[in-house]
Amino acid sequence: MKGGGLHCRCSKCFAAPPRRRIKRRPRVLTLLSLPEDVLLYVLECLPAVDILSMREVHPHLRSLVDSHSSVWARASFQDVWPSSENLNLFERAAECGNFEACVKLGIAYLYNEGLSVSDDGRAEVNGLKASRFFSLTERLNAGADPFVWLFIRPPWSSSGSCCKAVVFDSLNEECGTVTSGEGATGALKGSIQYCLAKVLSLFEDDDKKREALGMLESSASNGCLHSAYLLWETKQKAALSDPGRYLQSFRQLRDYAARGCWDAQISLAKACGHKNPLNQEQRSAGELVNQVFQSSLPINKSSIFTTQKGMNDTMRYILIDWLVEVATMKDFSSLCLHMTVGLVDRYLKLRSVPRAKLQLVGIACMVICTRFISKEILTIREAVWLTDNTYKYEDLVRMMGEIISALEGKIRMPTVVDYKDVLSHLIPLDRNTLHLCSYISELSLLYTELSMYSPAQLAAGALLLARILHRQARPWPAQLAETTGFTLEHLTPCVVLLHKKCFHDDAPRDYRQVSLTAVKQRFQDDLYDQISKEKVMDHTHLCELLGVPCHDSESPATCPNAADFHQFLCSPSGNKTKRRREESIQEDRGSFVTTPTAELSNQEEDLLGDFLDWSLETSCSGYEGDRESEGEREGEVTAPSGVLDLSLLLTEHPQCQDSTTDDDSITLHPIPLLSKAENGTDSIEGCVEKSSGYSSVSSGGSPTSSSSPGLPFTPTPGLNHSKLTPIPFPQPCSPLLKASRRQVKRKNQAQHSEDNLSDEL
């Protein structure tokens, strides 16, 4: 075609060059491409050591780390302890508001653990530094009771300078320099004064007790709610005789309870059960008591096994059973035991713990709880001895820091015992019913399936079950239903599951086929009227009385497989005696050898040399003030010993097989071995000789059935009292008691001469 004409689009006359498609380079996305707030969040979730590494990667990361204190405030120091190499890292994080760093630094300086200081003036230097970080800890303590006092509580060292006393004096001086008033400064002063008052109240000196009252008044004026409640407790007895003063006292208590003081809420609930002329006041307070029971939430303990990959129900059962035996032999209260188990469960839900350290976690939690609520403490060195020196002194000190920091200082939490005590004040209970309720409550600690119910429901269910087993005509009266908000219909599934787990299913057995019955042995004591020997109604009969279908499939007791099991825990009876069977006989406490009671310093340990066989020669730490009372040094209190060993026993090695009899004397030689899955080999370098006590079983075992006859309680508006009818019990028959069987408190075979120890101290 001629120029200027239109071209067609055929292939002959139109051949336009194809358009090139330019490939765009893909955008390279890196960590630095994230928004700054997201990048900051990533840095805050890193361990402290990794933050330093990230800081060296890029100038932008260095700028974020240096300019944002929140990175260090939220840095994790899990399984890291202060030392001379990382001291600057810990101090920087503490100054930025890192709670974990403050707790660990305070404990490290107090116990001289990890941070070596010259012996000249060690108590003064360490005490001042520990005081500084304990003060920072209370400043950062949000939502928990003031707790640093449990580390400096008496007894104090009577020889030479005492680090605890230095911390106390330093904190007292700090309170003197801080002006009283509202705000963060006043709240900090109130918390520290509360801690100082708690320390002073534990002395036997009357002058110190009066000084403690003055400290509480000053603390309450600075806004400390816990101090105000303690002052109310001291004045409450005098107010009972005067109706006007009682009314004022009752209103104060109601105010403290409404402001969130847990102890005040419990005291208020108990006061509602007393007969007094303030009926109108009680009715208004009854609504708050109902809220206390209804606000109790279930604690999902089954999530423990999500965090603890190598742990199962049986291993937890064995650990709790061992803690019950320790509490029994040391005469610790039921509240202390429940708090210890709660502390263990909460820590295991947060932090992954190697199997070899489960016993360490348990005994460390008991040390913390005894110091928090008991007058008589479990000393660190005695706790180490209870585990047969499986762990060192410094291991327990560090584990205490890990637990306190992981739980953010929240030690005291509502327990079944708290709600049980309230219920015992609401209606009159006979002695045997109260003991049976306590027995059921402690049995409930052993089973994770029961955690589907809240502590308040478990306490109510335990009381209801106890009254049914004792054939009360109206086991759940209208007064309890109105006060707690739990009706008989709501509690029936909980009661059925409690009875099934506690009385119907068989208890797990250890590797020697011995039933783990520490709770049963605990309640065979005359103190509890031997309530665990009572014959209990069978499960079928209970279901018939409650009108629910009976699932009478008994869960088989979990027994270890002889071809594959790990020795887990030894009884706290020492390594020379067997764990007592049910036919054991109770012995008098006075006939026992007392336990080590002194927390010796390095110098004192060098002077004593090999006289004290505590297997702590490698320990470079110690605190001379951590010892027990004078009465314990004279033999008034005894304690067991136990051991944790996770050596794998294989059938290919017949020399390692358990071939003991009940009369043999047992000796344990712990050897640190790893399982085949952990070290990738089938060989072992030694064998563990025949041992007594607890053992774990295969990881797939479970001591209980997973079936549950009911669902957790859901509060419903309104109470239906038409169903609160008497349960038709048959005529009572004479109870058939089992043969009298008591537990023997074992003597320690190691020779610890208390007379010579006192001379050296």
Curated annotation (Swiss-Prot):
- The record places the motif (Nuclear localization signal 1) at 19-27
Biased composition regions of type Low complexity, renumbered to the chain = 691-718
Which domain of life does the protein's organism represent?
A: Eukaryota
Region PEST, annotated ranges: 589-745
Question: Single GO cellular component annotation?
Answer: nucleus
Regions of compositional bias (Basic residues) in chain numbering? 739-749
The record ties this protein, via Pfam families, to: Cyclin_C (PF02984), Cyclin_N (PF00134), F-box (PF00646)
Q: Where is this motif: D box 1?
A: 316-319
Which cell locations does it reside in?
Answer: Nucleus; Cytoplasm, Perinuclear region; Cytoplasm, Cytoskeleton, Microtubule organizing center, Centrosome, Centriole
Name the predominant localization: nucleus
**UniProt cross-references to PROSITE patterns, sorted A to Z:** CYCLINS, FBOX
Domain called F-box: residue spans = 28-75
Q: Which segment of this protein is annotated as the motif D box 2?
A: 355-358
Residue ranges annotated as compositionally biased, kind Basic and acidic residues, are: 580-590
A GO MF annotation of the entry reads: cyclin-dependent protein serine/threonine kinase regulator activity
SMART domains named in the record: CYCLIN (SM00385), Cyclin_C (SM01332), FBOX (SM00256)
Disulfide-bonded cysteine pairs: these are none
Sorted alphabetically, which keywords does the UniProt record give? Cell cycle, Cell division, Cyclin, Cytoplasm, Cytoskeleton, Mitosis, Nucleus, Ubl conjugation pathway
Instruction: Tell me the protein family, please.
Output: Belongs to the cyclin family. Cyclin AB subfamily.
- State its role: Substrate recognition component of the SCF(CCNF) E3 ubiquitin-protein ligase complex which mediates the ubiquitination and subsequent proteasomal degradation of target proteins. The SCF(CCNF) E3 ubiquitin-protein ligase complex is an integral component of the ubiquitin proteasome system (UPS) and links proteasome degradation to the cell cycle. Mediates the substrate recognition and the proteasomal degradation of various target proteins during G2 phase involved in the regulation of cell cycle progression and in the maintenance of genome stability.
Which protein, by its recorded name, is this? Cyclin-F
- Source species, please? Xenopus laevis (African clawed frog)
